[in-house]
Swiss-Prot record:
The family this protein is said to belong to: Belongs to the Hfq family.
Organism, scientific name: Beijerinckia indica subsp. indica (strain ATCC 9039 / DSM 1715 / NCIMB 8712)
Domain of life: Bacteria
RNA-binding listed as a keyword: yes
Subunit details: Homohexamer.
Gene Ontology CC entries for this record: cytosol
Alphabetic keyword roster: RNA-binding, Stress response
Gene Ontology BP annotations: regulation of DNA-templated transcription; regulation of RNA stability; regulation of translation, ncRNA-mediated
Protein name, per record: RNA-binding protein Hfq
Sm domain residues: 11-71
Keyword RNA-binding in record: yes
Role played: RNA chaperone that binds small regulatory RNA (sRNAs) and mRNAs to facilitate mRNA translational regulation in response to envelope stress, environmental stress and changes in metabolite concentrations. Also binds with high specificity to tRNAs.
HAMAP family in UniProt: Hfq
Length: 84
């Protein structure tokens, strides 16, 4: 029996940038800057690809994720974008 629950913002964001192949800049907690496209993610890590090379990045090491272009994941006025 499946329970229909809304996806969290983190998963919604990562899935959106993965599906749309949005280039990202990821800053780690130690200040390192990584760039690439998300090809896969789970609860603990993100697989980032750039120039034919993949990097497995643990989420606990990520400080900030910046898309390379503006993105709109929700329609204006969409209730999915509001915490409830």
């Amino acid at each position: 029996m499946a329970v229909d629950r809304p996806q969290n913002l983190q998963d919604t964001f990562l899935n959106f940038v993965r599906k749309n192949k949005v280039p990202l800049t990821i800053f780690l907690v130690n200040g390192v800057k990584l760039q690439g496209v998300v090809t896969w993610f789970d609860n603990f890590c993100v697989l980032l690809r750039r120039d034919g090379h993949s990097q497995l990045v643990y989420k606990h090491a990520i400080s900030t994720i910046m898309p390379g272009a503006p993105i709109q994941m929700f329609e204006p006025g969409d209730e999915a974008g509001h915490a409830g």
